[in-house]
Amino acid sequence: MNHKVESVQGLHDDAFALYNNAVRGTADYSADTLINNLNEGINTLKSCWKGKDAGVQIQNVITVYNALVNIRNVLGKLAADSSKIASNYREIQNANGAGLSALSTITSEDKTILPDYVDTADKVDITPDAEKGKAKIDAANDNIANFIREVSKYFNNIMNNWTVGTGRDEAKTAFETFNSQSTQYKETLSSVSSNITTALQNYVF
């Protein structure tokens, strides 16, 4: 077994906590909630905000959406891999007479990124429904930092516990990269939100 684990039960527990609380949880800061909010915001804006500039702004949201999908998939795989490693270790412990309870595993299904979006219309058009799209984008933006904080609780434990193994270092690099770019993601969403407000103020309905 090409893995080194300090605490089998600890790895199992943190894997499930990461998956249930930070990846798939129903809290405002879970990856799935952030992704769903941005997806709703994108779809709303596509239907009610037209023009080249609108297309650029919507594409900016898609860029952040895809980054969230990618890190969500990485974290889901990390949780699944960690749970399987813990389960395998437990089987070995029990084969040696430990008599401990078997450990369950996680199956994580990836979400799909969105294709690029372009609006070539010269005429600008926007409806009041854009405010609903803005609200969804703001909701996601408000919770990116909370998402990172929640992930870090369990992610750091997993990294300190599972010290050697295939896939570990890739997950570590991916999360550190997302974390380092999170300020830019937040600034991007704030800029889009501000542009929606300006467009609504300037447009004559």
Which stretches of residues belong to each language-model region?
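N-terminal secretion-targeting helices of virulence/extracellular proteins
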Residues: 1-205
